[in-house]
Amino acid sequence: YMLELKNLVFSVTLKDEKNNDQKIDIIKGINFTFEKGKFYAITGPNGSGKTTMAKLIMGINRQTSGHIFFEGRDISDLSITERAKLGISYSFQHPARFKGITFRDLLAIAGQTEDEEKLLGIVRRMGICPLSFLDKPVDATLSGGEIKKIELATTIARNPKLAIYDEPDTG
């Protein structure tokens, strides 16, 4: 399997109305395998744990218990950076905006290339007009849809083994 979740649990501790600690399970005992080369969509209502599960897989949050296996290797205790080096990539629901950096700069960093044709190819795959968009600054002047396309394009540019897209159609 590409990815396997075994008894995955994520809990938080909150204070109740009497200021006592109360443990709440956000993710409770998930077992699932993801096969290589397939596309999976995880759906559910707001607050059902979709983003939490994505962040657990990427290592942004740490599971309370259970294990995450990537290509047969237990990655449960690996950092975000170590998981990224293994080929896991995460596209945020609300991407960051940067002052003083262009879309071209971000793509070159993500794709580890400054080859104009490769960058233009990635931009075209996103349905973006490359000539007018490539040198735009990635800042507050961009719409939500534009910043989301930039986020998705940089994920594609990294050419990951496993890409996790959190709400790819928002923005």
Mark where each language-model region is.
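The feature captures the beta-strand-to-loop junction immediately N-terminal to the Walker
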Residues: T43-P45
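Helix-to-loop junction immediately C-terminal to a conserved catalytic motif
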Residues: M58
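Catalytic Walker B motif of ABC-type/P-loop ATPase nucleotide-binding domains
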Residues: A163-E167
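Q-loop/switch helix immediately C-terminal to the Walker
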Residues: H94, G100-K118
